[in-house]
Amino acid sequence: MKQVKYGLAAGVLCLASISAHAEINQIRVWAAACANCHGTDGHALKGMEALAGKDKDEMLQKLMDFKSGRKPATLMHQISKGYTDEQLAQLAAYFAAQKK
């Protein structure tokens, strides 16, 4: 019986690891769309806003403001509407975790 419990626990941990790996890969796919303007992993070229290492909460607020139309923009209000609030939160966390 102990072996079954250990086997189930190992299986759950394995599935959690696979799920987390798939989630970070999905976030990287979303972040790749940002690279056109903000550079790879948020390291922008001169003249564009870098996202790497920015405060997560401030970045999320800015994204939500773009999405709602509170913050004027040429493209970001359209781009941000293509993501759920949760996806925007995950993107903000991803870029905040990148080294400047």
Regions found by a protein language model. Name each.
Residues 11, 68, 81-100:
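C-terminal capping alpha-helices of c-type cytochrome domains
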Residues 9-12, 35:
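Short N-terminal leader segment in a subset of presequences, especially plant chloroplast
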Residues 32-40, 91:
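The canonical Cys-X-X-Cys-His
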